[in-house]
């Protein structure tokens, strides 16, 4: 099954059975996946929209990863997603869970370790990812978390939450946004205030020319000059087409 991308980005939430994926998605989006204490309650992919400040990011609760392999349609979904949230239960041998998850991903040529992608001589799909230790409020979670963090923090961001108790969820939203490497840019017309409710979403490192093309496919070619507020030397001065934009910049395009 294919789920059309909505919002600023699409993030697939993955994990082993009963890791806490559905509880997490239910807690930070408008989705209502089935949440239960027993495994394999998620049979289909369920999308939901997560609000972060003035944008929305689509999260997809996916069926649990279970041996021997990832189903073809789920593999396709993970490849299409902009990033992955990897959820592991901190009370159930989180390091073993991570080993199982990465092994299943690598069988389908999906890697989350940049070093493996660089070393491989075959075509791999490298994905941005964030590791989430779930169920922080239970039993041995706080004791198991340091080992998870120490083993993976050089590769990927790692954090601990309790979706049920609401612990760490606001921080998680910000981590998701930062992981995506996107920026928000706002447009304005001369002598008018910018609309801060409808940003252009661009990849980090994008230029004024990229922003013009995002507004309309013809604008990049027709662009004569632009004024910028934010990352320019002085607010409102003209900037070159190759000026690299930063999160929160306001631009005024002149065609």
Cite the ranges covered by each PLM segment.
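Conserved G1/Walker A P-loop phosphate-binding module
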Residues: 1-95
């Amino acid at each position: 099954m294919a789920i059309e991308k909505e919002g600023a980005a699409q993030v697939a939430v993955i994990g082993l059975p009963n890791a806490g994926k559905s509880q997490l998605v239910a807690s930070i989006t408008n989705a209502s996946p089935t949440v239960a204490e027993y495994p394999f309650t998620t049979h289909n992919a369920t999308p939901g929209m997560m609000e972060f400040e003035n944008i929305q990011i689509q999260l997809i609760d996916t069926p649990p990863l279970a041996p021997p392999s990832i189903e073809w349609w789920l593999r396709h979904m993970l490849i299409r997603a902009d990033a992955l949230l990897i959820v592991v239960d901190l009370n159930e041998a989180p390091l073993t869970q991570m080993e199982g998850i990465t092994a299943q991903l690598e069988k389908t040529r999906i890697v989350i370790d940049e070093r493996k992608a660089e070393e491989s001589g075959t075509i791999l799909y490298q994905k941005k990812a964030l590791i989430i230790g779930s169920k922080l409020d239970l039993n041995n979670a706080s004791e198991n978390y340091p080992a998870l963090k120490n083993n993976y923090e050089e590769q990927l961001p790692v954090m601990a939450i309790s979706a049920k108790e609401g612990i760490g969820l606001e921080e998680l939203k910000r981590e998701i946004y930062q992981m995506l490497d996107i920026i928000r840019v706002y447009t304005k017309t001369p002598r008018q205030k910018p609309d801060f409710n409808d940003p252009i979403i661009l990849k980090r490192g994008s230029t004024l020319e990229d922003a013009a093309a995002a507004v309309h496919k013809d604008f990049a070619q027709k662009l004569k000059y632009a004024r910028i507020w934010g990352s320019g030397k002085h607010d409102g001065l003209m900037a070159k087409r190759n000026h690299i934009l930063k999160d929160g910049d306001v631009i005024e395009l002149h065609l």
